[in-house]
Amino acid sequence: DEKIDVIIPVSSYDMNAFTEPEVKSKRLDNKMLIMDKEMHRTLHNKESCYHFLAGLGICTPEVLVDQIRFPLILKQKEGSGSKGIKIIETAEDLGYWKKKISEYLLMEYLEGKEYTVDCLFRDNGTCLGWNVRERMKMNGGGAVISQNSNLYNQKVSKVIEKLERTGKIRGPVNF
């Protein structure tokens, strides 16, 4: 007889299913640590996520609308990790990928290392803990080789505080 205390889905694709109202009502007496459907959709869609973060005063890469500057990043609006992200060097490359990917964002290209912050938020919206990782090798959008980093902890802490003040984020979240 095993007793389940809490279920923590770790993939944003799993969360899509678990936030649906008919599934939510059957979630093992609400023992699943997960945010509501609307907030999940906000964070899962890159465009709405950047707007949400910017509204909290959190710096995000510039979304290019009118002025296209190469190189740039083309990324799918929906998704997680680095899946569907393309570095675009020329107008020809841009034309090619715009035909292949229907819903996308064009973003400024930032040179340097890629970091991700893994967070776990309590049901009341406070952050239980977070970890900064450098993404060193990617496969299928996820980091297959990463290294923990204590860089930027003060800056990350201030971002986490802004996210906590919303009271809307619950469960595992990666930024």
Question: Which stretches of residues belong to each language-model region?
Answer:
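A ubiquitous structural signal for well-ordered alpha-helices
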Residues: 21, 97, 159-163
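Catalytic phosphate/metal-binding cores of nucleic-acid and nucleotide-processing enzymes, i.e., regions
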Residues: 175
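Active-site nucleotide/adenylate-binding loops and adjacent lid/helix of ATP-dependent enzymes
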Residues: 37-113, 121-127, 153-154
